[in-house]
């Protein structure tokens, strides 16, 4: 680094400290490590991590970064699974500044709770908690909310979710900053709320909670994926119901993946479903679940609340390696989970510096902790696990409960398999077990890191008319794997496929073989975790990124695109 650059950076960092206070600026690599390292994988260098305390401070920090020609990486909870929330390596052509929005966690309820205004650090959990007394729910419930994921992070990555009727996270109403073609920072207010003219007026009004009912307009723009229920019912369509790069779901902040700095989003909320009932379905024939899905989506008057699939293998892995997660949520509640994940992240970062500790110490310790407790799953679930390879957790509500029960009784008079009507405790534990599955494969890999090469995690969206949903791998690929773990959102045909790879296997080459097979099946990937730095963005998505960020100063390199200024390619 030249002396001029060092001097310039010193002045720049002094300016950031002046804007937010020195206690809200980190430059020591040891202290910035947990913000530079991804939730599952991925890391890189950063000049600084800065924590603005108001939207106006965020605007001023952005302006300082643009003036100093720095790369800007917006980060909220850093719970992304595909490395899109952190720097990627050290081959950028400019310094990287991470702007953490964790302090900007306000939430504004509009009207009687039919809509909300979420800020950059608002978490799904805090939104869920605020809406509960109003009898309403956000787009996403148990899942991302338990690990402190942010609302805006979900919008920016059009995240999915387990709720069949709500589709991917989406809005057409947001407030965002964009760096234009001339390298100038501009603030765009498309919230449909009168907040003033200048950035200072607009942001101060939000910071001070000075929004009146008269300021809010209802002009026909959508604050959720309004036609998803029609798409998911179209079982003859030759395309997936939802996936990250769907061109029809890319709109300004929605799907921007950090190419815009999003200050606020306006979102619809949903009436909480009452009188819910879980049906636990088991079969040894995949085509039975195919028939159930197609019949329900095409013929039921009432769509399911959720329909979650688990294969017996992930059932077993989750029972053993997701036990501590299950017990913590079951005994302590979801509100404690963000704290524990945060604590684990801090502990891991600290222990990495101590040579005495083996890698994944906290995972190994929590695994041993889980063994101290007796079996946690209900007897009827265990019985179904022994009988059946394929499991479907079908949750219905209201009139849908009777509709599903009468049809399932008739259907299983001739179909292979069976179902039982869960008690409230069984239903809760069944879905909690399914949630624990999402982290169980990672835990398995961490505990057995000496014996396995890595985990290859894919999330895929199948065509809605596909009847061959259950994967059969060729022997040359199957022989490279220790475990194949299949689970997902069955009604939406979105599957999480985690492969535990044998020691010594080239994981990158294996992944390319896997993706080739998925392309042959007409699947889209990723389905809901977004491209991050692990997947190549398709051309339509790259075009969207270029339109949002013409100078390539915001989260460059995402989707395996250029990291260089003005989208220059490496020669």
Swiss-Prot record:
TM region(s), chain numbering: none
List of residues binding FAD: 76-80, 84-85, 143, 150, 160, 262
Domain notes: Contains 3 domains: the flavin adenine dinucleotide (FAD)-binding domain, the cap domain and the membrane-binding domain.
Lineage: Bacteria, Pseudomonadati, Pseudomonadota, Gammaproteobacteria, Enterobacterales
Family: Belongs to the quinone-dependent D-lactate dehydrogenase family.
Keywords on record: Cell inner membrane, Cell membrane, FAD, Flavoprotein, Membrane, Oxidoreductase, Quinone
Regulation: Inhibited by 2-hydroxy-3-butynoic acid, but not by p-chloromercuribenzoate, n-ethylmaleimide, or 5,5'-dithiobis(2-nitrobenzoic acid).
Subcellular location: Cell inner membrane
Record has 4Fe-4S as a keyword: no
Biological role: Catalyzes the oxidation of D-lactate to pyruvate. Electrons derived from D-lactate oxidation are transferred to the ubiquinone/cytochrome electron transfer chain, where they may be used to provide energy for the active transport of a variety of amino acids and sugars across the membrane.
Region (Disordered): 546-571
GO molecular function: D-lactate dehydrogenase (cytochrome) activity; D-lactate dehydrogenase (quinone) activity; electron transfer activity; FAD binding; flavin adenine dinucleotide binding; oxidoreductase activity, acting on the CH-OH group of donors, quinone or similar compound as acceptor; quinone binding
A single Gene Ontology CC term: plasma membrane
GO biological process, one term: lactate metabolic process
Membrane protein topology class: Peripheral membrane protein
Coarse class of the protein's main subcellular location: membrane
Protein name: Quinone-dependent D-lactate dehydrogenase
Catalytic activity from the UniProt record: (R)-lactate + a quinone = a quinol + pyruvate
Enzyme Commission code: 1.1.5.12
Cofactor: FAD
FAD-binding PCMH-type domain span: 42-213
Gene3D superfamilies noted in UniProt: 3.30.465.10, D-lactate dehydrogenase, cap domain, subdomain 1, D-lactate dehydrogenase, cap domain, subdomain 2, Uridine Diphospho-n-acetylenolpyruvylglucosamine Reductase, domain 2
Source organism of the structure: Escherichia coli (strain K12)
NCBIfam families named among the record's database cross-references: PRK11183.1 (NF008387)
């Amino acid at each position: 680094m030249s002396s001029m650059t060092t001097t310039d950076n010193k002045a720049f960092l002094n300016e950031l400290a002046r804007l937010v206070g020195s206690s809200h600026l980190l430059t020591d690599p040891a202290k910035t490590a947990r913000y530079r390292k991804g939730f599952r994988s991925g890391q890189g260098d950063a000049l600084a991590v800065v924590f603005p305390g108001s939207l106006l401070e965020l605007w001023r920090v952005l302006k300082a970064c643009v003036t100093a020609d720095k790369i800007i990486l917006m980060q909220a909870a850093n719970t992304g699974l595909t490395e899109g929330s952190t720097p990627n390596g050290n081959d950028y052509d400019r310094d990287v500044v991470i702007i953490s929005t964790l302090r900007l966690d306000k939430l504004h309820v509009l009207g009687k709770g039919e809509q909300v205004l979420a800020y950059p650090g608002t978490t799904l959990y805090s939104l869920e908690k605020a809406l509960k007394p109003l009898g309403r729910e956000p787009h996403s419930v148990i899942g991302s909310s338990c690990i402190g994921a942010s609302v805006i992070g979900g919008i920016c990555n059009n995240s999915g979710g387990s709720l069949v009727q709500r589709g991917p996270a989406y809005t057409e109403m947001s407030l965002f900053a964009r760096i234009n073609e001339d390298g100038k920072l501009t603030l765009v207010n498309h919230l449909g709320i009168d907040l003033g003219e200048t950035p200072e007026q607009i942001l101060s009004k939000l910071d001070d909670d000075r929004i009146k009912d008269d300021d809010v307009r209802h002009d026909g723009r959508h604050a959720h994926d309004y036609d998803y229920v029609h798409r998911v019912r179209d079982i003859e369509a030759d395309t997936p119901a939802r996936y990250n790069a769907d061109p029809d779901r890319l709109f300004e902040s929605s799907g921007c993946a950090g190419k815009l700095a999003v200050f606020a989003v306006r979102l619809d909320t949903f009436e909480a479903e009452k009188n819910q009932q879980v049906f636990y379905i088991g079969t040894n024939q995949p085509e039975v679940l195919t028939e159930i899905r197609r019949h329900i989506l095409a013929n039921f008057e009432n769509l399911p609340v959720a329909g979650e699939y688990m294969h017996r293998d992930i059932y077993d892995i989750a029972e053993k390696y997701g036990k501590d997660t299950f017990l913590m949520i079951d005994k302590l509640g979801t509100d404690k989970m963000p704290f524990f994940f945060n604590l684990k992240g801090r502990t891991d970062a600290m222990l990495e510096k101590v040579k005495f500790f083996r890698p994944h110490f906290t995972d190994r310790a929590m695994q041993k902790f889980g063994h101290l407790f007796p079996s946690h799953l209900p007897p009827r679930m265990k019985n179904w696990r022994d009988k059946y390879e394929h499991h479907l957790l079908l949750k219905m509500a209201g009139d849908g409960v009777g509709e599903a029960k009468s049809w399932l009784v008739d259907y299983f008079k001739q179909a292979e398999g069976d179902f039982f009507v869960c008690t409230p405790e069984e239903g809760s534990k069944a879905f909690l077990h399914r949630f624990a599955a999402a982290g169980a494969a990672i835990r398995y890999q961490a505990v057995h890191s000496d014996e396995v090469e890595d985990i290859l995690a894919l999330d895929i969206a199948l065509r809605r008319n596909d009847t061959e949903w259950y994967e059969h791998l060729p022997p040359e690929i199957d022989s490279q794997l220790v475990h194949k773990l299949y689970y997902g959102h069955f009604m939406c045909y979105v599957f999480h496929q985690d492969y535990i790879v044998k020691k010594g296997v080239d994981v990158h080459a294996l992944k390319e073989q896997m993706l080739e097979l998925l392309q042959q099946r007409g699947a889209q990937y990723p389905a809901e975790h977004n491209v991050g730095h692990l997947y190549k963005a398709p051309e339509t998505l790259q075009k969207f990124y270029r339109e949002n960020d013409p100078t390539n100063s915001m989260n460059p390199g995402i989707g395996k695109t250029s990291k260089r200024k003005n989208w220059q390619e490496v020669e």
